UniProtKB/Swiss-Prot annotation:
NCBIfam families on file: nramp (TIGR01197), Nramp_1 (NF037982)
Subunit architecture: Forms a complex with NDFIP1 and NEDD4L, in cortical neurons, in response to iron and cobalt exposure; this interaction leads to SLC11A2 ubiquitination by NEDD4L and proteasome-dependent degradation. Interacts with NDFIP1, NDFIP2 and WWP2; this interaction leads to SLC11A2 ubiquitination by WWP2 and subsequent proteasome-dependent degradation. Interacts with COX2 and TOM6 at the outer mitochondrion membrane. Interacts with ARRDC1; this interaction regulates the incorporation of SLC11A2 into extracellular vesicles through an ubiquitination-dependent mechanism.
GO BP annotations listed: cadmium ion transmembrane transport; cobalt ion transport; dendrite morphogenesis; erythrocyte development; establishment of localization in cell; heme biosynthetic process; iron import into cell; iron ion transport
Originating species: Mus musculus
Membrane-spanning segments: 70-90, 96-117, 155-175, 180-194, 209-229, 256-276, 302-322, 361-381, 409-429, 441-461, 483-503, 507-527
Cellular compartments per GO CC: apical plasma membrane; basal part of cell; brush border; brush border membrane; cell surface; early endosome; early endosome membrane; endomembrane system
Biased composition, class Polar residues, residue ranges: 30-40
Stretches in topological domain Cytoplasmic: 1-69, 118-154, 195-208, 277-301, 382-408, 462-482, 528-568
Modified residues (Phosphoserine): S564, S567
Protein name per UniProt: Natural resistance-associated macrophage protein 2
Extracellular side: 91-95, 176-179, 230-255, 323-360, 430-440, 504-506
Record-level Gene Ontology MF annotations: cadmium ion binding; cadmium ion transmembrane transporter activity; cobalt ion transmembrane transporter activity; copper ion transmembrane transporter activity; ferrous iron transmembrane transporter activity; iron ion transmembrane transporter activity; lead ion transmembrane transporter activity; manganese ion transmembrane transporter activity
Cellular location(s): Apical cell membrane; Mitochondrion outer membrane; Extracellular vesicle membrane
Membrane topology value: Multi-pass membrane protein
Length: 568
């Protein structure tokens, strides 16, 4: 229903299990279907995913900080941080080190900080409203824009899933010394993902502990490579804290843009806003909401600090060992060490170009087989952890946008099939060069989808009717708007550079047509965002107002269990 600001609102006691129906207003009359479905009584079983249990928060009076409470809130941030460690990020890291040395570490640091600030907004939306970003989008946008937005986010998730499958398949191929072909690795990844996804049947904390275990494996394996290579610590610190890039040309600039595109993942905003709902927070109590926001932010800081250090390990290893190395130098070292992969590189004086597969091979040539196998274990952990969180993202997005009751098994079958089929075809009919080359295209795809997460999250967290006193202040609105504009511009530059490299007129025409449609939709979302940021004159004199509710006191949705997600 559409909320009339003049209507008398039901009080807390009368709102019932679906009291948020009144609080979910609309931008315009097209939003008349935005309320939650009415209760059908006890005959309908609750349907949940990830939220079968909620972690209780210990009560401690007169404490501004408690490690017990921090531990209770720990989990969602580390699951979110997996997206900063997926195979796409690892490939971006090693290419950054090989192309620019230590010079772009400050870009990685800046991108991680920007990502942290955006994740803060996503977590706050979930905590304050009790709804994750996809659910809010379902209730706010009209049907056609909502479906387009859902398709764009699904495309980003599928693209990310393909990167994760590629990374896992390459890792399995390296670990088996080539005995398991790439297509075999793809099939193995399908099977083990189903096994891992049902770990939460044994409890939410055990699932979060398993993700923590995978992050620990990445830290140990990539940390081992870091210790083995022994990069210059002064160079690492200089590259991290001195924002400059002397002697950088187009390849280095493109790599810097690629770092931003790889680090800030669109589906991660949807994921994090849903994960925070796994903690017991009484949204009727502003102090509890404020406390939850604080601890979730602290946890996110810790989690992204860990992911940043792991990324620094990878960049530094390839910066120290392989920056400005030529193919001929690598071939000689590989032959001297009797490596079976010496013929992987052309024997010329062109600069070494590396990817996840070649990176492991080169490490094996220079530092022994142990370095290769440990690298592969780290890549496998990155691929497995990120493919699991990607599946959760897909489930939350589908449930939120479509209000669709789908089992996780069916959801995984669908998205995995879409992601696996093209990856499997390339693995069967092409070689590892083409498989790893898909990562470049997929990074561009992720960059294109970024506005479809950043603009909605900034829009809804800036609305006082949605967030009440927890809405973004004027400083956050201005900074957030500038931030979104810069990030989207950087990523569009990345896309333009990629399209120019295609070198075919027909592809230019297709790209131009798609760009017009793409920019039109981004403009629509941006227009709605600017209205939310306070530029009300842009509403063209329409009578509706943007927001979930016309009465801010209902923002907490404190009488509704908004965790309406599907059963397995």
């Amino acid at each position: 229903m559409v909320l009339d600001p003049k209507e008398k609102m039901p009080d807390d006691g009368a709102s019932g299990d679906h009291g948020d129906s009144a609080s979910l207003g609309a931008i315009n009359p097209a939003y008349s279907n935005s309320s939650l479905p009415h209760s059908t009584g006890d005959s309908e079983e609750p349907f949940t995913t990830y939220f079968d249990e909620k972690i209780p928060i210990p009560e401690e009076e007169y404490s501004c900080f408690s490690f017990r409470k921090l531990w209770a809130f720990t989990g969602p941030g580390f699951l979110m941080s997996i997206a900063y460690l997926d195979p796409g990020n690892i490939e971006s890291d090693l290419q950054s080190g090989a192309v620019a040395g230590f010079k772009l570490l400050w870009v990685l640091l800046l991108a991680t900080i920007v990502g942290l600030l955006l994740q803060r907004l996503a977590a706050r939306l979930g905590v304050v409203t009790g709804l994750h970003l996809a659910e809010v989008c379902h209730r706010q946008y009209p049907k056609v824009p909502r479906i387009i937005l859902w398709l764009m986010v699904e495309l980003a998730i599928i693209g990310s899933d393909m990167q994760e499958v590629i990374g896992s398949a390459i890792a399995i191929n390296l670990l088996s010394a080539g005995r398991v072909p790439l297509w075999g690795g793809v099939l193995i990844t399908i099977a083990d993902t189903f096994v891992f996804l049902f770990l939460d049947k044994y409890g939410l904390r055990k699932l979060e502990a398993f993700f923590g275990f995978l992050i620990t494996i990445m830290a140990l394996t990539f940390g081992y490579e870091y210790i083995t290579v022994k990069p210059s610590q002064s160079q690492v610190l200089r590259g991290m804290f001195v924002p400059s890039c002397p002697g950088c040309r187009t390849p280095q600039v493109e790599q810097a843009v690629g770092i931003v595109g790889a680090v800030i993942m669109p589906h991660n905003m949807y994921l994090h806003s849903a994960l925070v709902k796994s903690r017991q927070v009484n949204r009727a109590n502003k102090q509890e909401v404020r406390e939850a926001n604080k601890y979730f932010f602290i946890e996110s800081c810790i989690a992204l600090f860990v992911s940043f250090i792991i990324n620094v390990f990878v960049v530094s290893v390839f910066a120290e060992a392989f920056f400005e190395k030529t193919n001929k130098q690598v071939v000689e070292v590989c032959k001297n060490n009797s490596s079976p992969h010496a013929d992987l590189f052309p024997s010329d004086n062109s600069t070494l170009a590396v990817d996840i597969y070649k990176g492991g091979v080169v490490l094996g040539c220079y530092f022994g087989p142990a370095a290769l196998y440990i690298w592969a274990v780290g890549i496998l952990a990155a691929g497995q952890s990120s493919t699991m969180t990607g599946t959760y993202s897909g489930q939350f997005v589908m449930e939120g946008f479509l209000n669709l009751k789908w089992s996780r098994f069916a959801r995984v079958i669908l998205t995995r099939s879409i992601a696996i089929i093209p990856t499997l075809l390339v693995a069967v009919f092409q070689d590892v060069e083409h498989l790893t080359g898909m990562n470049d295209f997929l990074n561009v795809l992720q960059s294109l989808q970024l506005p479809f997460a950043l603009i909605p999250i900034l829009t809804f967290t800036s609305l006082r009717p949605v967030m009440s006193e927890f809405s973004n202040g004027i400083g956050w609105r201005i900074a957030g708007g500038i931030l979104v504009l810069i990030v989207c511009s950087i990523n569009m530059y990345f896309v333009v550079v990629y399209v120019q490299e295609l070198g075919h007129v027909a592809l230019y025409v297709v790209a131009a047509v798609v760009s017009v449609a793409y920019l039109t939709f981004v403009f629509y979302l941006g227009w709605q965002c600017l209205i939310a940021l306070g530029l009300s004159f842009l509403d063209c004199g329409r009578s509706y107002r943007l927001g979930l509710t016309a009465q801010p006191e209902l923002y907490l949705l404190n009488t509704v269990d908004a965790d309406s997600v599907v059963s397995r």
